[in-house]
Amino acid sequence: MNTITVYEHSNFQGLHKTFTSDVPNLVNESFNDCISSVKIVGQPWILHQDINYSGQCLPLEEGEYSGISMNDGASSLRLITDDLSNPQITVYEHVNGGGKALVLTEETNLAFGNMHDNISSHRVQRGAWALYEHINRGGRCIVARAGEYLANYCTIGFNDQVSHVYPLRAGKTSVTATILWDRKKVESERNVQIDQYFYTNNTSIEQQFTATSTKEFEKYVSHSFEFSNETSIKVGTSFTLKGVVDINTEVSNTFTVKKGETESFTTRKKAELSMPVKAPPRSKLTVNFMCKEITISVPVELKIVRGSKTDIETGTYRCESGTETYIDVQSLPIS
C-alpha cells in the first residue's frame, strides 16, 4: 500500500491525515497550507504549492520527514505510480529535442559536464525524474514522468536552468511467499539406526518391558530456501514462509528468509528414546531404535511488489527432518 501521512506541525505533531491516492485540492480535505511534516510508505509523492498539481513542487520518497522545505505551503498531493525500477531520460540542448542530447540512467550533477544550465527539452523513456535548478537537488524543480515529452522549457519558465537530475526511487520491495504444498516432492527418505538393545525372555510367559536407548538422540529439522537463478530480489530483502515444520509441536511455524543473509536454519531438540516392547515366551529380541530421515522440496510462489509494479517469481523451500522415531523388533526363538 502506498500512503502519505501529513501532519499539521513538525516532528509529526498536531492534526494528521493519511492519503492513498492523488489529492488535487487539499482545501476539500480541510488540510490546505498546513503541512509541516510527512511520513511516506511505498512510492514517492509530490507536494505541490497550488491546487491541481501546479506551482512549485517537492518530491519526497519513502521515509519520515520531521520538517519540510514547503512548510505550510502544500495545496495538492500527487502519487507517483510509474515503474521506477529502470529509469532513463534524454535531455536536449535546444527546444524540440534539438542540439546535443544526453541520455541519463542515474542521478547526475550537470555542473560536472557540458549540459549545465543548458537544457531546453526532454523525453522520459522510463521512470520518474526530478530536474533541479541548482546542484545537490537544490532550488526549484520539475517532475518528469514516463512517456512525457516536454518540447520547450520556455513554456514553464525553466529554460537553461537545470543543474541536477535525479531519478525518483521506489520504496522497499514487498515480498509475499506462498508455499505450494500440493506440489510437494519427496527427494529422499531413509531409515537410520540410532541404537540397539538386546533382551532375552527365558520364561514360558510373554514378558512386557520398556526398552530405553543409552545414547543421546537429537531430533532435528533443517529449513532452507533457494532463489531462482533469474531472481530480481536484491540482497537484504526479507519475507516470511508460513506453515513450515516446527520441531517442538511438529506443526506449522514460520521461517523468515533474508536474501544473502538468512536463507537456512536448523533446530535441534534432545529426546529420550523409550518404548514399550513385548517379548514372546522363550525368545531372544533385538530391538533397533530407528529414525526416519526425510527430505522434501516444495515450490514457493513469490509475489514481488515494487511501488505500482507486481512480479511473480518462484523459489524452492526444502526441509530435511529427523523427528520420527520408532523401533524395529526382531525375535528369534531359543531352545
UniProtKB/Swiss-Prot annotation:
Task: Name one process (GO BP) from the record.
Answer: lens development in camera-type eye
Return the CDD domains for the record: PFM_EP37-like (cd20230)
Expression across tissues: Epidermis specific.
Keywords (alphabetical) are:
Repeat
Span of domain Beta/gamma crystallin 'Greek key':
2-42, 43-81, 87-126, 127-169
Q: Which SUPFAM superfamilies match?
A: Aerolisin/ETX pore-forming domain, gamma-Crystallin-like
* GO terms for MF: structural constituent of eye lens
PROSITE patterns linked to this entry: CRYSTALLIN_BETA_GAMMA
Q: Name one Pfam family in it.
A: ETX_MTX2
Write down the PANTHER family for this protein, in alphabetical order.
BETA/GAMMA CRYSTALLIN, BETA_GAMMA CRYSTALLIN 'GREEK KEY' DOMAIN-CONTAINING PROTEIN
Domain text = Has a two-domain beta-structure, folded into four very similar Greek key motifs.
Q: Which family does it belong to?
A: Belongs to the beta/gamma-crystallin family.
What is the recorded name of this protein?
Answer: Epidermal differentiation-specific protein
